[in-house]
């Protein structure tokens, strides 16, 4: 039995051979246990902690973005534009239950893992177009998101 987050037909060996660092893999409902682990108020509270690394991105227009870094206070979340995103890094340090997600990826060498990040945004909120220079597992807990992938080759 596959105890990882992979579909039954994809073993860790198949994932590493055919997908890891080669092509994206969408797994719908891959981690149902994380639903409701963090709600919006908990994310906002974490972002206000001095020890947390967080970013707030405000989109004022199609090509006008503004980046703010933590720590934040409650006033920072008032009068937000329609489109914004908040990101919190190293979530495994603040949520032991979410930190246990690494167990679902035990087949990935530990030296290739960085952190667990949470992103929250209203409808239409985004961090904008960007490239990640490292491997990323994106876990969308709820809501709808439009993901676009570009072949970097």
Predicted regions and their residues:
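Active-site region of the double-stranded beta-helix
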Residues: 1-18, 31-153
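Non-catalytic, conserved peripheral segments adjacent to functional cores
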Residues: 21-23
């Amino acid at each position: 039995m596959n105890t990882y987050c992979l579909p039954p037909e994809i073993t860790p060996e198949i994932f590493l051979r055919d997908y890891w660092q080669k092509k994206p893999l969408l797994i719908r409902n891959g981690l149902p246990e994380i639903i409701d682990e963090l709600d919006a108020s908990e994310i906002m509270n974490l972002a206000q902690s001095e020890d947390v690394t967080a970013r707030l991105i405000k989109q004022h227009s199609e090509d006008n973005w503004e980046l703010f870094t933590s720590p934040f206070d409650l006033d920072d979340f008032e009068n937000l534009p329609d489109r914004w995103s908040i990101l919190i890094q190293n979530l495994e340090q603040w949520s032991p239950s979410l930190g246990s997600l690494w167990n679902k990826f035990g087949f990935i060498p530990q030296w290739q893992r960085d952190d667990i990040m949470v992103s929250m945004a209203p409808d239409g909120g985004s961090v904008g177009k960007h490239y990640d220079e490292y491997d990323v597992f994106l876990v969308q807990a709820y809501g709808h998101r439009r993901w676009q992938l570009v072949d970097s080759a």
